[in-house]
């Protein structure tokens, strides 16, 4: 790492934290990772090294001082009396040796390890009172998780009653077997619903359901591997596993006790080779000091136990041949290249396609038709070309020529300013129309259940719809002509379409799929201007008067509504009975109070509530909670170990409240 000044390090730390917070939120709260594990781990390690080099930059809210992600769901919250910590990660055998040497130095002698498979699932705590299951919860941020007790009662291998009247807590992993995952995705695909990216996401989404009946259908499983307060006669990790197994918990029997690192490495090699043959997913191997008294002696850091470490498998690579490069058109006109390859088994699934993202990426990789390429799965999820094997390139190979016409409508493709993507700007492009209707019906927009990609394609192919307004003119007779569409499906879809007419107008605005206008921007615009027809007449200055709405969003929105076709579509939707009004939020209905219409920033370690809970309380009072201090900030609320935000507030003379002072004003 290059030598940085203190100011440069401070800026870099802020940049890394923002990235990691976003990625952690996608992973933990949304069950939708957007970067591969290796990218996340490298970025996280860079932050750790900077904080070690500049200790004064460490803050209580840094991701290096937290476990997991903030809790963002409607499930009840559960506080963990004993925090559910995450594990430290290593990525090589040399790092494992260093871990062993560190343990040996700390305890003064060599130790035995219980070596276990690292299950790719969601952490789960099970609490029993007098032998009966009383609570199940997720890890959440390590201190506060989510109550999933009702759902746990429908997981077949979780004992509801123990053979002995124990009051205890055990922990493990909730996962979905590969076969159950394949069945679930096949069912969702058949219904036109979005499929899950991987078994871990499927398990997390299934366990965290508000409706336990859905969990029951998802066929989840568990492996239990930790006993929080084991009986005194249990003195080792391997003994704890055996005893938990005797009590009826589902434990993984592949783990072994080793006294040398050579044995550990052989175990790693064994499961690296056969991981894809297992019925469940694993993403590494876990080493745990076997002696429980030594575990207690070694203790924990603020985030991870010192007595255990996770070895992460390197990405598996395979070679295959590129046979074609296909281009597909998205709803905003972006045209994306995809490599079509000879099918190859990779990380347990057959892969024959990999995205090449954009023309610059394609040129950078230098991929040509006929090339042999090395392929891996980013984060064990997304197929990605690592490199071209130049030694195997055919002698008659020619550089690939980027197309200049749209593969759907034949119009000339363009590069817009400051964009790497190619675009089709023909508003009547069939592919864009299809993708636009799919987006309109999606859960984040109009939420028309049962209107997935397959159904949309059939409706377009049969000439029943040409734009989103046509959805509201569909008849039972038309839907009856679709493949595998029976009476119940017809009734449900028409009912969902009818119900969508009552949605708040920001969902309709987002559903229109205007470039750069995401769900948050749509909500902010409608919060201020209330009516979608009024929004369609706004100018760029009127739109940019809204905090966080910049010129890019404003210009895109005004350009869209300046098109006669857009005004015609809006009129057709209004005539079909769609609501054009913003229906409001809790914040608008808040009575007069100290924080109403104030801009507030939280910083430091809060004790009475989690940060997300405190934020929600303030928002319910009509406050706007932001992440950074500026001249527009009305109040900074700070807890223990407040850092740079408090310093900045002092410089800007922003009024400050302690956590307790703020709570007192909330409770007035």
Curated annotation (Swiss-Prot):
Keyword Zinc annotated: yes
Family matches, as InterPro entries: BRCT_dom, BRCT_dom_sf, DisA/LigA_HHH, DNA_ligase, DNA_ligase_AS, DNA_ligase_CS, DNAligase_adenylation, DNAligase_N
Kindly list the positions annotated as binding Zn(2+). 406, 409, 424, 429
Which GO MF terms are attached to this record?
A: DNA ligase (NAD+) activity; metal ion binding
| Positions contributing to NAD(+) binding | 37-41, 86-87, 116, 139, 173, 288, 312
Q: Which UniProt keywords apply?
A: DNA damage, DNA repair, DNA replication, Ligase, Magnesium, Manganese, Metal-binding, NAD, Zinc
Which catalysed reactions does the entry list for this protein? Answer: NAD(+) + (deoxyribonucleotide)n-3'-hydroxyl + 5'-phospho-(deoxyribonucleotide)m = (deoxyribonucleotide)n+m + AMP + beta-nicotinamide D-nucleotide
What is the protein's species of origin?
Answer: Lactobacillus johnsonii (strain CNCM I-12250 / La1 / NCC 533)
Q: Which residues form the BRCT domain?
A: 590-668
**One GO cellular component term noted in the UniProt record for this chain:** cytosol
What EC number(s) does the entry state?
6.5.1.2
The UniProt similarity line reads: Belongs to the NAD-dependent DNA ligase family. LigA subfamily.
Q: Which PANTHER family match?
A: CHROMOSOME TRANSMISSION FIDELITY FACTOR 18, DNA LIGASE
Pfam families in the cross-refs: BRCT (PF00533), DNA_ligase_aden (PF01653), DNA_ligase_OB (PF03120), DNA_ligase_ZBD (PF03119), HHH_2 (PF12826)
Q: What is the gene name?
A: ligA
Report the record's Gene Ontology biological process terms. DNA repair; DNA replication
> What residues make up the catalytic site?
118
Task: State the function annotated in the UniProt record.
Answer: DNA ligase that catalyzes the formation of phosphodiester linkages between 5'-phosphoryl and 3'-hydroxyl groups in double-stranded DNA using NAD as a coenzyme and as the energy source for the reaction. It is essential for DNA replication and repair of damaged DNA.
Disulfide bridge positions per record: none
Which cofactor(s) does the record list?
Answer: Mg(2+); Mn(2+)
The protein's name in its UniProt record:
DNA ligase
């Amino acid at each position: 790492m290059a030598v940085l000044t203190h100011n440069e390090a401070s800026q870099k730390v802020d940049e890394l934290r923002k990235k990691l917070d976003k990625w952690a939120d996608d992973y933990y709260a949304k069950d939708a990772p957007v970067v591969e594990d290796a990218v996340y781990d490298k970025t996280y390690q860079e932050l750790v090294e900077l904080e070690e080099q500049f200790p004064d930059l460490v803050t209580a809210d840094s991701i290096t001082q937290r476990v997991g992600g903030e809790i963002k769901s409607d499930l009840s919250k559960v506080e963990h009396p004993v925090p559910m910590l995450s594990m430290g990660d290593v990525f090589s055998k040399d790092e494992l040796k260093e871990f062993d040497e560190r343990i040996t130095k700390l305890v003064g002698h060599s130790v035995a390890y219980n070596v276990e498979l690292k299950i790719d699932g969601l952490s789960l705590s099970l609490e029993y009172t007098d032998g009966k299951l009383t609570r199940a919860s997720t890890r959440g941020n390590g201190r506060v998780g989510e109550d999933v007790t009702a759902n746990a009662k429908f997981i077949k291998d979780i004992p509801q009653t123990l053979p002995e009247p124990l009051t205890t807590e055990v922990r493990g992993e909730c996962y979905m077997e590969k076969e159950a995952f394949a069945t679930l995705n096949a069912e969702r695909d058949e219904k036109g619903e979005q499929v899950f990216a991987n078994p871990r996401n499927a398990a997390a989404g299934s366990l965290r359901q508000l409706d336990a009946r859905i969990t029951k259908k998802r066929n989840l499983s568990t492996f239990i591997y930790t006993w929080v307060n084991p009986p005194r006669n249990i003195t080792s990790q391997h003994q704890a596993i055996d005893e938990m197994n005797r009590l009826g918990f589902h434990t993984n029997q592949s783990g072994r006790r080793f006294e040398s690192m050579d044995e550990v490495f052989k175990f790693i090699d064994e499961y690296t080779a056969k991981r894809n043959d297992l019925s469940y997913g694993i993403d590494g191997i876990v080493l745990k000091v076997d002696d429980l008294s030594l575990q207690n002696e070694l203790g924990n850091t603020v985030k991870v136990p010192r007595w255990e470490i996770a070895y992460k498998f390197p990405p598996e690579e395979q070679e295959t041949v590129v046979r074609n490069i296909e281009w597909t058109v998205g709803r905003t006109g972006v045209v994306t290249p995809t490599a079509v390859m000879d099918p190859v088994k990779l990380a347990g699934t057959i892969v024959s396609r990999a995205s090449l993202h954009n023309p610059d990426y394609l040129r950078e990789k230098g991929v040509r038709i006929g090339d042999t390429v090395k392929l891996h799965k980013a984060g064990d999820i997304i197929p990605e070309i690592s490199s071209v094997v130049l030694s195997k390139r055919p002698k008659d190979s020619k550089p690939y020529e980027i197309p200049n016409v749209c593969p759907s409508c034949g119009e000339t493709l363009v590069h817009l300013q400051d964009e790497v993507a190619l675009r089709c700007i023909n508003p009547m492009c069939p592919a864009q129309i299809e993708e636009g209707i799919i987006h309109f019906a999606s859960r984040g927009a109009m939420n028309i259940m049962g209107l997935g990609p397959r159904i949309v394609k059939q409706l377009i192919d049969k000439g029943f719809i040409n734009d989103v307004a046509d959805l509201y003119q569909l008849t039972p007779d038309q839907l009856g002509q679709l493949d595998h569409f029976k009476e119940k499906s017809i009734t449900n879809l028409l009912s969902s379409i009818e119900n969508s007419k009552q949605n708040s107008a920001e969902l309709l605005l987002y559903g229109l799929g205007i470039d750069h206008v995401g769900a948050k921007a749509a909500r902010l615009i409608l919060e201020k201007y209330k009516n979608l027809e009024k929004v369609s007449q706004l100018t760029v200055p009127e739109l940019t008067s809204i905090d966080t709405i910049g010129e890019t969003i404003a210009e895109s929105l005004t350009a869209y509504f300046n098109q006669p076709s857009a005004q015609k579509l809006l009129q057709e939707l209004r005539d079909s009975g769609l609501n054009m009004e913003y229906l409001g939020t809790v914040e608008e209905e808040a009575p007069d109070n100290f924080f109403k219409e104030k801009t507030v920033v939280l910083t430091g370690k809060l004790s009475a509530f989690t940060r997300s809970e405190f934020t929600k309380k303030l928002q319910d009072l009509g406050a706007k909670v932001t992440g950074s201090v500026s001249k527009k900030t009305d109040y900074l609320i700070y807890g223990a170990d407040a850092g740079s935000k408090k310093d900045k507030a002092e410089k800007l003379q922003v009024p400050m409240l302690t956590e307790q002072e703020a709570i007192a004003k909330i409770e007035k």
